[in-house]
Amino acid sequence: MENINIEYGIDSNLNLDKFQDNEMEIKNLSKSFDNNNNNNSNTNNIKNNNRERSRRKSLSMPLLEPLPKPKRPPVPPRAFLMNDGADEKITNYIPTTPPSINITFEKKEDGDNYDDNYDDNYSGEDIKTSTTPPQFNSPEFNKNKPLPPIPIDQEKEDYHTMAPKPLPRVPSKIETFNDQNNNEGLQNSTSPLSSSPPPLGNLLNTSNGWRSANKPIDSSFSNIAPKRSTTLFDVTNPTIFPSSLNSSGSCCSSSGSGGKSPSNFLNFEPSKPNFENFDDYVFGNDSSELSQSQISPVVRTRRQRVFTRKAATMKLLDNGVDTDDENESELSKKSGTTLDSEPNLKSVSSSNRGSFVISKSSYNLRGSCSDEDDQENQTTNKNNSNNNNNNTTTNNNNNNNNNNNNNKDTLKVTETKHGRTVSLPEEPVSTLIPNATVSKKRPSLFNKFDFKSVIFEKIEEQQQKFESIPSRRSQLPYINDSTIFNKVVKEIIETEADYLDHMEITINFYLFAALEMVKYKILEKRDIFSIFSNFEEVYHISLKIYPMLLNCIPLLEKNQYPNIEEVFLFNSKSFQRYGSYLSSHDSCNKFLQEILLTNQTAAQIFQKLIPICKLNNLHSFLIKPCQRLCKYPLLLKELSKALPKEDEQNHKTIKRTTSLMGKIVSDINGKMKNDTKIQEIIKEIGTKDIEYLLHHQTFIGEGKVKKVNKNGSTSEGTLYLFNQRIVFAEKNSLFNKKATVISLSNISRVCDYDYRYPSGFAIYHNSKKVSTSSSSNLGTLSLGALIIISDEKLKWMNKIEDQIVSERVLAGTYTYVTNHFESFKNLENCSFSQSDSQSDFVDHDIQQEQQEQQQQQQEEEQTRVKIPQIVEPLSQQHDQPKLDHQQSSIQPKLSFPHLKQPKQDEKPIKKPKSPKHKNTEPENFSFY
C-alpha cells in the first residue's frame, strides 16, 4: 500500500523534492548543534540525543494504520483555552513550532516510538537573529546553577534518568509556509484524497504526531492524555511549562518591550532573541489578528476534559477583574474568566509557552493518579527545585476595587499583547478538612485602639478640673491658738482637712483611672472592690464629721471650751464601718501588688498618676484611713490633758469619748485578729464546708479535749467555741480529718457527766447535727449528746452556758421567768417604780386558764335547769386575795416546752425517785 505522512495531511503527489531538500538541511543543521550540551554533566543527554535522531527517522507511517503503543505515556499539551467554560466549544490548541518534515514511502523502521517531547520542549526562539540560541538546560543558561547531588541510596544511572531532557536542536533556516505559498505549491499537484489541502496553520499536534484538523479520525486513533499526579509544585519552571497565551489561542512572547509583561516579574532574564514576529514567521500572519473562523476545532482530549471540569468546579464567572494596567483590565473583561478564591492572591506568570501557570494552591480534581505519574512528577520537582526557587514570581494585586464592587476576591486572568497573567490564591492554611477555606480574622478596631492614650487624656482633663479647686486647709478661717486646748483643736481640724483632700485625690484619680480601665476591659468590675474595698464609704464618714468640727471654731475665738468630744460620740456608730475596711486592707494590698506585676497596662497607668498625686502611689493613699482611725484616740487624750482640772464635767465627757474611740479601735483590731485566727482554724481543720460554717464567726476559745465515742472509746481532738457554734475537730490521720459542728441555738442543756467520767460533761441537743468531713458532707441526728472530757470542765461549761444565753437574747428567743416584760418591749424606758414592784402580778397562763374555766361554767349554767343554788357562784370561787410579791407562790414558767406546768389548784405531780447520781441520761439519745 502506498504510504503517506498523515500527520501533515499531505498527499503523495505533492512536490516532495522540495520537502526532502528542506529535511536534509535540517538534518545537517542538527549535527552542527551537537556541541550545545557537551558541557552538561548529565550523561542522560547523550542518550536523549540518540533517541531524538531515531525518532526523526521514524516519522512516516502507513496510511490509516495506527502507530504502535509508546513505551511511556506521552506528555500532554501544556495549556488549553476554554470558551466561557462551555464543554462543547473548545478553542484550538495552536502548536508553537513547525514540525520537521520527513516523507518516505518505506515501511517504518524499528526503534523508539515517537512522542511529542520534541514539540513540547521546543523553545520557539527566533531563528533569524541567532542560529545558536541558549538552551534552558545548557551551561550558558544554567550558569552557577549546578544539578542537585546524587542521593546516596540511588545509583548513578537511575538518578540521571530523572534529569530533564535536553532540548532538541533548533534549525537555523526554515522556509516560511503561509497560505499563499501553500496554495501555490499545492495547486499544481493532484491528490486522490484532497484537491485543496488545508494550510499549515490548521495542522494539529496530537500525542501520536501531527495531523490535519479536517481529516476524519480513525476509530483506533486515541488522544488520551496521561493522568497527572496530585503533587503540588511551587511556581512552574520555564523549562517545564510554556508561557501564557493570547486571546486568539496562539503562543505569545513574554519578553516584549512596553507594558507590564509577565516576564518582568521573573527573578531571571535569560538572554534570548526577539520573538515578536515568530507567529507571523510560522503562520504567515500575526497570531493576535487570527480570527476564530480561521482556527479549526480540536478534538477534545481527556486532559482537556480535566481542565474543563476543574474550571467548572472553581465557579468560573463572566465578570472581569481589575489589574494594574488599564489595557490589561480591558482584555480581562473580554476574556471573562474569574474564579472565587481567597482574599490574598498571588499573580504568577511563567516565561515559557503554551500553558497556564499552576501554583501551590491549585487543586487536582481528578481524585486518583497512578504511581508512575507520581514518580514522574516527583522527578520533575526534584530536578527543577533550584529553578523553581529562583523563578518564583509574585504580584501583590490591590483588592480594594474587588472588595468594593463584588465583595469577593476572584482569580485574575489578564490578557495583554505580551501574554496572559493568571492570579491564583495564596497557599491555604493547613486544615483537617482538605481544600477547606480558612477565614482570616481582620484585626478589629478595638484591638488597634490605643487605650492608654485615651485614659491619659481623660486623666489630664481631670487634673485640670482638680487644680482649679483650692485645698480645704487654705479655706479654713483663722483659729486662735493662744492656749494649748486651742492648739489641739486646731490640729484636729487641719489634719481632718488634709485627710479629706488625700481621699479626694484617691477617688478623683486612682479610682477614676481604675473605672476607665474597666470600660476598656483592662480590669474587671470585681477588681475595683478587691483594691479599694469600701473606701468611698469611709470618705463620706469624714465628709460628715468635718463641718461639725468647723462649728467649734467660733467658740475658740471666745476662749471657750467647745464640746468637740460630742462630735465623736454622735458618730460612734459610723466609725464602726472602718472595721470592714481595716480587716480587708491586707488582702487589698496583696491583690494590688499582684495586679501591678501581672497587668502591664494597669501598672503603666498607675505609674503615670504618681507625679499628679503629690508623688504618692496608691499604696500610700489606701493606708491613710487606718492611720486616721488610730490617731483619733491619741488626739482626744491630748485634748483631755489640755483641759484645766477645774472643769470636771468636760473632763468626764472627754474621758468617755476617749475610751469609746479606744474601744472602737480595739474592736476593729480584735476583729482583724479574729479573722486571722479563723483563717488559721479553717486551714487546720481543712474540711469541705468548714469555711462556710465559720463565716462571720467570732472566736471565743479553744482547748485540747477528749470525746467519748459510741463504743466507749475516746478520741483526742480540739474543741473550738465561737459566738454561734461549737466545733470539735479530730484528726485520725494525715488525710482523714473530721469535724463536728453544733449550733448553740440547738443545744438543750449542758450538764455534768461525772457518774462515768469524773472530768466529763455532756452537751445535749435536740436538732440536726451538722457534721463535715473530707469524705462526707452533712449528717442528721434527731437527738444526740457530745461527751467531752477535760480538766477544765467547769470553765468550759460556764463559757458554753453564757454564750448560749447571750446568743438567745440577741436572737430574741430567750424565755424569761415571767412574761410581764413583754408589755415593756416597745417602751424606751424599762425602769419600774416601787408601787409597781409591790403590786400583785399574776402569771399570764394562770389568768388564761381561769378565763377558760369561767366560760365553760357559764355555758353549762345556760343549758342547765334553774335549781336553787347549792354551790357558791363561780365568781366567789375564783376570787383571789391580793398577795404581796414576797408571799406570792406563783410557779415560774420553765424554759423547756415539753414539760407541763402544774396548775395552782392541782396537786403537784410526784417525780420518780432519782438514782444515786445527780444527772440522768435522756431515754433516746446517741453519742457522736
Curated annotation (Swiss-Prot):
Keyword Transferase part of the UniProt annotation: no
Compositionally biased intervals (Acidic residues): 112-123
One annotated GO molecular function: guanyl-nucleotide exchange factor activity
Record-annotated DH domain positions: 484-671
Gene Ontology CC: cytoplasm
Residue stretches of biased makeup (Low complexity): 30-48, 377-407, 848-857
Name of the protein this chain belongs to: RhoGEF domain-containing protein gxcH
Gene field: gxcH
